[in-house]
Amino acid sequence: MKKYISLLLCCAALWLCACVSPEQSAEAPTTGSNIEAAQAVNAEFTTDDGQIKISIHDGNADAIPAAMPVLRVRPKVITSDIARQMAEGLFGEAELFECSEELSKAEIADMIAVYEYAVTDESIRADHGEDAPQSWIESVRDARLAILEYYRNAYAMARDEVTPVPCEWKFYPMEHYAVHGFDYAGSDQYYTDTFPAGMSVDLRAVTELGGVPYEFWVNNNEREDFRNHSLSAFVLVPDFGETAEERQGRTREWYMSMGLYSDTAADESALDAACARAVELSEEMGLGEWRFSSAAVDRTASTGEGWQIEITGAPVYEGYPVNWQSAAGQDYCPESLTIRMANSGALIELQYTSPMEVVEAAEQAAALKTWADMEPLAMQTMRSLSYETLIPNYASEKEWWDVIGAVITEVRLDIDRVCIGYTRVPCDGGSFLLVPSLSFPGKLGVTGYIPGVHESPMELLDRDGDGYNVSLDFDLRDGGRIG
């Protein structure tokens, strides 16, 4: 069965469109005087095949400059030095400590006793059933014996008392941080700035800021099928482990005790302050220039965390944001920065993905297309759209709709922003081009029903009913559609 919710959560993280409203965003940088005047764009029409309704409404569309360089960028590994700068930007002078599963001698002795019983037939059959096949019993026993042997070896090298170890700014394979994986012998291979191809390594640390516990987690994944360089910093909420309702209640209490909880939405001044704080953080962390938008989000019903501020960033190059970075057909996540804050401005979570570095900037000999050039080209392309050329992953979506017997009644694309900036496209050698582009980001909705199952109109792309992010992007050098 298709997992729509997981897919859409991933898309929300990977397919960022950072065309933001002025009242909730950091001030856009000045890009020069040699630009056209801003445009009002208003149009409603149906595609030539009569299947898709498109509406475009933006009273202040971005102006098109006369020139923008084409940039070649490549993924930037997060080294130990870069990770240290990020941590200092986030936490100031607060000391970070190694994140580990280290146990004291006494605690290991307890684990040895636990696993000496866990390897017995009585324990295994109690966990897996009296009628469990003997082959299964033996496989479970082998796994538990390996853990028992691990603790027996660890006992001789363990400390009598476990005290925090200051962060050593070393990257380890992920197993280093696993339960039953602490390196008591100190023999695990580590890295600081060069990571072998095909390997994923982590640097994890913990700290406190204003009495709130945080984890700081950096990953460099150099595997062939999918690369990743990312940072996560987040509050360490205790694992309450009860029912969902009880967890929400305990989470609410914990957030209140930490001063992170609010039962009302942030007002405009708080949203603006959050964007300003995001700009400060990105500068202090050495992340380059970003443009931010913010929104109040209510997480009370889902997690018990209350109202928070969610800030979304778009990277800025040469004074222009990267408006669209499709993940389709690529082995590297879009460059993104998302932050969650309490209404007070206290950090709750920060996710930074796919840092890039510019390796070449190519000035264009010819001027960019003007709005007079682009408007008819864009409208003509939109009118010729079909399900196949508009709906992301249409073949697989159609296959699923056919399986469940869905009947489409309406496909609608609502565009409320027209943006000038860069669109990221794959290039050779694992790098990317940032292409000057005119973007029409919007919400794509596919409405339909399932005869005999769900007769009332339903959203076929998004079961939560929030639409589906898409962007129609046009190359300002030649007017062609990108992607």
Protein language model regions, located:
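Intrinsic disorder/low-complexity detector
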Residues: S6, E36, Q325, I404, ...
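Positively charged n-region of N-terminal signal peptides that target proteins for export
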Residues: M1-L9
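C-terminal motif of bacterial Sec signal peptides marking the signal peptidase cleavage site
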Residues: W15-A18
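Preferential activation on post-signal-peptide N-terminal prodomains/segments
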Residues: V20-A328, M356
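Segments that shape or occlude catalytic/ligand-binding pockets
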Residues: Y255, L260-S262, A274-G442, H454
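A short, surface-exposed beta-strand/turn
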Residues: V212-G249, Y320-P355, V446-G483
